[in-house]
Amino acid sequence: MAPQKPETFMLSTEAQQALPHDAQVALQQVDNLKYFLISAPVDWQPDQYIRRFLLPTGEYVSCVLWNNLFHISGTDIVRCLSFRFQAFGRPVKNSKKFEEGIFSDLRNLKSGTDASLEEPKSAFLDFLYKNNCIRTQKKQKVFYWYSVPHDRLFLDALERDLKREKMGQEATTVAVSEPALSFQYDSSQSLYEQLTKTQQANSSSFSAQQPAFPPGQSSSPVMRNMDAMPRPI
């Protein structure tokens, strides 16, 4: 059973299969990005400090090794989310307001546990700036790679805009193509809660269909590897 994606979990299976080819290609590109977000810190060379991923928008997202920890900048997080909204069929039309919302959400990630708080023009910020990972060297948090809840950030930003539209206010993104045009918003609970429940229901259904294995034995080496992954995104 295919995992539920934040971009399409509100659509029926039939609707997902009926998506236009362009939409399916765009969502596959999102999957490619997600794979990078999971796997980027693996298999680095001894003298390697940065690994890049080229987004279809032409911008790069970078995984940066500094002080033996892998990091991602707030600027690159926004780049990831801007691309995901474009692939979803809801491109960003008010970049400043969109970015402000994301950085407001990122305040929930605390220095020391989820991020490194860098002083202005520190050696780390200088490296990030020279590699186009940040736009300014002012004091800021740089986030630990596996501490960033990318799906949650996407859904929270989407929910903000859907609520704005429902109240007749200007949203930061606009639905222009599928699957965004078919996305049905239920305001009785948060999108993240709805996605979590859908994933749990699918997981329970999937587990019920699987043969029993002895304790400690996984049915798949892929599942064993995923079990060992640091905090899921």
Question: Can you name each region flagged by the protein language model?
Answer:
Residues 28, 35, 39, 79, ...:
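Charged/polar, solvent-exposed surface patches and flexible loops
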Residues 61-97:
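Short, amphipathic alpha-helical interface elements at domain boundaries
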